[in-house]
Amino acid sequence: MTPADLAELLRGTAAKVLAERGLDVSVLPETLTVERPRNPEHGDYATNVAMQVAKKVGTNPRELAGWLADALTAAEGIDSADIAGPGFLNIRLAADAQGAIVAKILEAGAAFGAGHTLDGKKINLEFVSANPTGPIHLGGTRWAAVGDALGRILSTQGAAVTREYYFNDHGAQIDRFSRSLIAAAKGEPAPEDGYAGAYIADIAAQVQQQRPDVLDLPAGEQQEVFRSIGVDLMFAHIKRTLHEFGVDFDVYFHENSLFESGAVEKAVETLKDSGNLFQEDGAWWLKSTDFGDDKDRVVIKSDGNAAYIAGDIAYFQDKRSRGFDLCIYMLGADHHGYIGRLKAAAAAFGDDPDTVEVLIGQMVNLVRDGVAVKMSKRAGTVITLDDLVEAIGVDASRYAMIRSSVDSSIDIDLELWTSTGNENPVYYVQYAHARLSAIARNAADLGIAVTDPDFSLLIAEQEGDLIRTLGEYPRVVTSAANLREPHRIARYLEELAGAYHRFYGACRILPQGDEEVGPLHIARLALCDASRQVLANGLALLGVSAPEQM
């Protein structure tokens, strides 16, 4: 019996108890919640439903809890239900009902944890979207890992997810990039507002290989060649780096296409016609304060050029025209102002601002010998995704980026993430999977078949703790999807690995010496198989490998 199964049983029982006493059943929440007590001596699960409902039906919480306890104790799969405090219920499952979680996992396999909370939802998930002016830095690496994991998690809950990369190939930064390439090709210092670093010299050399005559061209043509070929080369490198990191996109959307197609101009005219733009000092402004933004925003500057928000507005309209119910933007720490402006732009078109969701990620620091390594793309000292992977590997890089909430900054300690001990979170989780895989191999070598396990034999404290932890997995995945928090999966996997390691230390799994294979061995092997499956499922959602041996 999973927590969801127990919650369903609890609601049905509560409805019956209220109805039998002529009390209002409609006061019951649609879904009841059961939690694991911090102290396992208090039971397997606890609920405060009696305290939630008692006042609404005119009774005492402890009295209602007593009615519920009597009814639950008589229910199949419940060992006991005890009242605590002002009306809490502490519930213990029967051993066979608790063990049924294991059977459910083995039956579902890779699908265990999948749900339907987002069925029919069409989501556009835009992340990374780094400018094609340099390699992906640590901030972009965080979004690559978190965004990819979030896409996987949303998909498990039934959403149709499109992973999208917004290719910023329009604007002043591309001009600065091309001028930086020209300077490098000529052996001159980078422009003051340009980009520097070895990668600039490398790309400049590649442009010259493709166009040996480029420096002989007139200045305007010269810059266009460096711009066109340089951006293509840089973006090819970005895509290759992301692919090697396990991140691929369904759509690469070019910002420039919004201007070439007239989409920006059309969006601006629509806003003018609706009265949501006003002119002041020669510029056109969006009345974004009318829609909750902290200030009005310039859309068309006084020189007639479009401000950056003009492209954002047209881009959002393009997404909605493609039928997306929800547009999630994953942006860097310096983009807090975008939340209000994007929602205001949606509202100005008569759209629901809740179709826009913005996640803001905080800074990432790489720590070497206890000192944070500074990074600056323009100064040429950028720490890149490639650098991080070279230092600690793909799995550790992804896991390190995902395991913390995106609204907190993180320090990645090279020594920690390359260590082979329990202090390294990804090693700790992967080692649990590898150890479980070794047990499965050893059982196969002994000719042991895991058939018809008797889960009622799994009564040891460590067995119960492991089973209950396994049962939490679907709820964790659902929460991670609904709250857009992939770190919940990582933290859960660490908890599960800990529960497994404690079980492994306390319970002998395989027969030793001349000992015959008994029902308890079979039940414990089934529990191991279920644990291995859930670890593999969770790691897959994070895009991290589940090694068979280490």
From Swiss-Prot:
Gene3D superfamilies: Arginyl tRNA synthetase N-terminal domain, HUPs, Isoleucyl-tRNA Synthetase, Domain 1. GO terms for biological process: arginyl-tRNA aminoacylation. A motif ('HIGH' region) lies at residues 130-140. GO terms for molecular function: arginine-tRNA ligase activity; ATP binding. It is found in: Cytoplasm. Its main location: cytoplasm. GO terms for cellular component: cytoplasm. The keyword Transferase does not apply. This is Arginine--tRNA ligase. It comes from Rhodococcus opacus (strain B4).
